[in-house]
Every structure is written in C-alpha cells, then in structure tokens.
C-alpha cells in the first residue's frame, strides 16, 4: 500500500487479545513472497474491519445455503460464482483501474439483472455498508465518484462493484480481492457450524480463485 496516501478514516484499534482471523495470500508469478506479505499486511486490518461490519449486520450475502453446506457451496461456487459473480468482480476491477465510472455503473446495473430479488437486496445493503465505512477516507478517486453516483440514484451500489473499488483503493491485488470475497461468503454461511466444520482451506479458496481468473494470465501461489 502507498505509505504517502492520506487516509483520515482509521479502523478501530484492535483489542489486545482476539481470535486469529484466517486469510489467504496469493502471490503473482513475478512477485516475491516478502513483497506480497508486506503489501497484504498493510491492508489486513482494513479488510477485517470492513468485512466484520458486513458480517455483524447481515446473515448472508449472495450465498444463502438451502441445505447441507458443502454441496450447497460447491453448487454456488461452480454455478453463480463462476458464471457471473466472479466475472463481474473482474470486470468491475478493470473498470476501476481504468477510472471508467460509466462502465462501472453499467456493470452495476447489469448485475441487478443477474441476481434474484433477495440477493439483489442483500447485495445493495452490503455495498452500502462498505460505502459508509469508507466515506471519510481521503483521495478516493473513482471510489468517491462512484459513491456520489450511488447516492444520486444513478447506480445500485452492489457489493461486488463497491468491493472492486475499495480493494483498489487499498491496493489489493485482483487475486486477493477475489479470495477475500469468497472467504466472506463462506464465513457468513458457516459461522454457526462447529469450528471443525466451518473451516475452508486456503487451497480451496486458491483453487476457486484460479478458476475465476482463468484466462487472466496470472500464476498464483498460496503463501499464507
């Protein structure tokens, strides 16, 4: 993360003692492990704080399992995620990188047509949480312009669209933006399960991330 960037909105100080939070760090082929871990550690507290706000306020995001979790997750991952949620996140991230607000708004409206009414409502609610919790940060670029458009009713404010902007603001790689989204979906669905049944392996997240990124010419390694 760029140390010169001035961000006035700071996450609450973490408690002295807390449970360890699992994360998945994916390294691009031309990136060193040390650099990847350093970049990720700088954004880790923000990601944990922002996503904890979503988890605290909502029961589910897009994934609301109708039955046993493992088969429901497999169907969701290979269906909804690979068919439209993952591609949307990639396209939104590309629009953010190019500073193309009109493209970002168009993608946001397109996603509305791919979600059922309940998913769309939860997606907008979660997107609103991210937008509110990053409002005070300075030098937001396209994230700030997108927020203004959403507040003016020009775009729905879906979670994945907002997350693409937030991830870029904190200089997260596309691979880690995708991986942390997947972890959030799983954690929200599995939070009431016994600990031994609620864990999703790093390799599982990395494998699905690779599938989503297929064709993006990225080689990924799990390092933490």
What are these regions (language model features)?
Residues 7, 18, 42, 55-57, ...:
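Arginine residue identity/basic-tract feature
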Residues 67-71, 110, 130, 224:
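Amphipathic alpha-helical hairpins
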Residues 19, 26-102:
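Glycine/small-residue-rich interface belts in oligomeric ring/scaffold proteins
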Residues 72-76, 148-149, 181-184:
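Short linear loop/turn motifs
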Residues 90, 95-168:
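Internal, conserved structured core segments that host functional sites
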Residues 47, 82, 86, 116-127, ...:
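Generic structural signal for well-ordered, non-membrane alpha-helical segments
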């Amino acid at each position: 993360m760029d140390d010169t960037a001035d961000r006035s909105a700071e996450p609450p100080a973490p408690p002295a003692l807390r449970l360890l939070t699992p994360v998945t760090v994916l390294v691009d082929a031309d990136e060193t492990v040390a650099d990847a871990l350093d970049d990720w550690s700088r954004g880790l507290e923000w990601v944990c704080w922002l996503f904890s706000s979503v988890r605290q306020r909502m029961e589910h995001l897009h994934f609301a399992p109708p039955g046993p979790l493992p088969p429901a997750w497999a169907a969701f991952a290979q269906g909804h995620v690979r068919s439209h949620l993952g591609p949307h996140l990639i396209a939104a991230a590309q629009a953010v990188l190019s500073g193309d607000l009109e493209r970002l708004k168009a993608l946001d409206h397109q996603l509305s047509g791919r979600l059922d009414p309940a998913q769309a409502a939860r997606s907008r609610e979660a997107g609103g949480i991210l937008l509110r919790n990053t409002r005070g940060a300075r030098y937001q670029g396209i994230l700030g312009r997108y927020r203004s458009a959403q507040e003016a009713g020009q775009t729905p404010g879906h979670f994945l669209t907002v997350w693409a902007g937030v991830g870029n603001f904190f200089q997260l790689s596309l691979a880690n933006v995708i991986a942390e989204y997947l972890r959030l979906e799983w954690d929200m669905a599995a939070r009431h399960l016994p600990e031994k049944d609620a864990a999703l392996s790093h390799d599982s997240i990395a494998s699905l991330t690779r599938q989503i990124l297929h064709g993006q010419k990225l080689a990924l390694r799990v390092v933490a």
